[in-house]
């Protein structure tokens, strides 16, 4: 019995040595191993419930295997457009929870900071920056925005948009709220064009983000670019109106979420600076003149570049409860709201 046990131990040691050598060899040649008996990846030293993807190198989805990444994200600028003086532009409606507009703005910023902070801890080689561009917010609200930003370890800045710079550019007679909205978006486009970044995320100030939103968008963008071999657009929200039309679509696997191909959106989206510069003249139309639907230039862009929306939502648009452009399905709205009361 003793000899039998010793032989088993010796064989186990030999197997372990062989296993270690094999794992090292796989690492050298870039192969990953999945051990289905332990639900782990010995070559990555991770279990299967963890993120197996290596940012900028390979996207790994079990059981489909890996996608070699052909576009590595190195910098992301998040441009948050704020205005606390208007509850809902040109509408006499209240938002869900029926609070003042500034509270939605503050919680949007906090949620972005939290999500970006988590992403920055995962992706040490990506440069992040949060830029807040504001029009017509009250002095007290601007002070609060600065206070929130002061607690943010991510590089950031607050820019007050001078509306006078756009009076000669924007065509038509618009309400103060609509003019400010157009000017703020136009200013964001100019920032995106001139800033040193390869990825830009345009955000409106009533989208509360989940903690994993920025991480999922970064890894999914790299994966989808590598699949489509072209720049694309990612939305953070699973809009209700997407379910009101009987349209054919396609579903793709991102990092941890399903993503669906869509043909329409609002004006919160992430894309590359290359795409913005290439189609700047088309996007600029949204800042020069309001033609319904205002997002039409974006919709035209989606005919040549894929636009994808997550399922379930990574961010929720806190609009009126009856708006088909608002609350995403199957999300705990109250929990998301409460989580962003503070940083």
Where are these regions (language model features)?
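Conserved catalytic core of nucleotide-sugar-dependent glycosyltransferases
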Residues: 192, 199, 210-283
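Membrane-proximal basic amphipathic "stem/tether" segments
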Residues: 1-61
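C-terminal catalytic/acceptor-binding lobe
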Residues: 273-343
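Active-site-proximal specificity loops/subdomain of glycosyltransferases
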Residues: 138-197
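Short, acidic, metal-binding catalytic loop of nucleotide-sugar glycosyltransferases
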Residues: 96-104, 108-125
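The conserved acidic donor/metal-binding loop of glycosyltransferases
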Residues: 205-208
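Short beta-strand/loop segment that forms part of the nucleotide-sugar
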Residues: 124-137, 161-163
């Amino acid at each position: 019995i003793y000899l039998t046990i010793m032989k088993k131990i010796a064989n186990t040691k030999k197997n372990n040595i062989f296993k270690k050598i094999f794992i090292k060899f796989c690492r050298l040649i870039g192969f990953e191993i999945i051990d289905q008996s332990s639900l782990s990846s010995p070559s990555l030293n991770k279990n299967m419930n963890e993120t197996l993807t290596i940012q900028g190198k390979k996207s790994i989805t079990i059981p489909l295997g890996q996608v070699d990444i052909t576009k590595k994200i190195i910098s992301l600028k998040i441009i948050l457009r704020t205005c606390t003086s208007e509850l809902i532009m040109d509408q006499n409606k209240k938002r869900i929870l029926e609070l003042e507009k500034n509270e939605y703005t503050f919680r949007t910023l906090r949620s972005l900071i939290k999500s970006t902070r988590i992403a920055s801890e995962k992706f040490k080689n990506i440069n992040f920056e949060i830029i807040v561009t504001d029009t017509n917010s009250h002095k007290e609200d601007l002070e609060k925005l600065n206070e929130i930003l002061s607690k943010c370890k991510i590089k950031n800045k607050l820019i007050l948009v001078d509306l006078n710079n756009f009076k000669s550019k924007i065509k038509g007679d618009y309400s103060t709220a609509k003019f400010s909205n157009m000017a703020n978006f136009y200013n964001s486009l100019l920032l995106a064009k001139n800033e040193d970044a390869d990825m830009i995320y345009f955000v409106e100030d009533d989208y509360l983000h989940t903690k994993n939103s920025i991480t999922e968008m970064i890894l999914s963008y790299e994966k989808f670019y590598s699949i489509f071999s072209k720049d694309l657009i990612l939305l953070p929200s699973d809009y209700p109106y997407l379910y009101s039309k009987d349209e054919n679509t396609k579903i793709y696997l991102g990092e941890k979420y399903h993503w669906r191909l869509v043909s329409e959106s609002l004006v919160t989206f992430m894309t590359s600076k290359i795409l913005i510069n290439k189609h700047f003249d088309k996007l600029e139309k949204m800042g020069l003149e309001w033609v319904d639907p205002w997002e039409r230039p974006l919709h035209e862009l989606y005919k040549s570049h894929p636009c994808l929306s997550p399922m379930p939502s990574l961010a929720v648009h806190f609009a009126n409860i009856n708006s088909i452009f608002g609350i995403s399905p199957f999300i705990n709205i109250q929990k998301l709201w409460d989580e962003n009361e503070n940083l």
